[in-house]
């Protein structure tokens, strides 16, 4: 890094990036040269891949990974690739979850030729999202004592993984590892293909779970995906609702619901403030003070509290993601601050689960934060239909702000429906 580490830039999260590329493939609509006009760019032809990290120990983290995977598919992902891991039951769960939701998206399995050295790094949490259990590390350490430092057994393990992925109906595999030669890839693919008829024999020796690990689905006797997989959410208990969240839900219904009387009144209030900059600044300062004290508000002007169960993603998520967590958390802790900061999305999950709204985490799409609204009133932008939540229809409250930019000409493109063929 030049004179220190550069600041992270999170203008788009992974779901938003997939959504953008999908729109590019359709022909992206952009502002035209003349004010008030648009132009459509020539369609691109990207094959869109998206990742999922199923090797999570807790319910919250695992289900959030599956939910975000679903969001990526709805946003336009053409295939899914897994993070590397060594628990075949978790690999299979990726396909079982997609089947339970009616998706037939191809899934690529990750085959990493794991050495003892790389295993030690991953076992200690040195590669976020990559899990190597103590049991597997002990095996790798013993294998490293062989004359070839365990290479033959590593290649054999990789070939067995190829065979199992083929048997479980995966669309393909990604083979990786350090210092592999062309001959090694040939050996893995050829041997794995030859062993494919015996793939079930290899499952037990490729199943390295974690202590007290949560699984979304019961064990499969056949290790195959059924066309009638049950939605795992239906098996989850709701849990208790935090009092603070219950109060915010009540407040939202009274003040922020689009058809409420208070909403109409607030629209008129902020419309009037538009004509008085000094009063608007005072009002904005008071709003920011309240929201900063209660939620850690960063004054982005395009508030996502409604979308994230009143846990501000700008303040609480290290990557400011609005559509779910990254894949780097472990045991509920943030990848960036693993010893001091809990993953913001764990609490968001618990809150929405307590109110029976988990579908918001897998079906809802939150557009990118509108940077042009930074340091402006988030409440004003909401009530005057300037932020990402603005509906496509004309202002139903009759409190038109008089600003042509207050209401977008059309809503963001809806996420596509599940693939069924």
Residue ranges and their predicted role:
Residues 78-87, 176:
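Catalytic beta/alpha-barrel core
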Residues 8-59, 96, 100-161, 179, ...:
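Active-site pocket-lining/capping segments in soluble small-molecule metabolic enzymes
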Residues 59-75:
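Active-site glycine-rich loop that binds ribose-phosphate moieties when present
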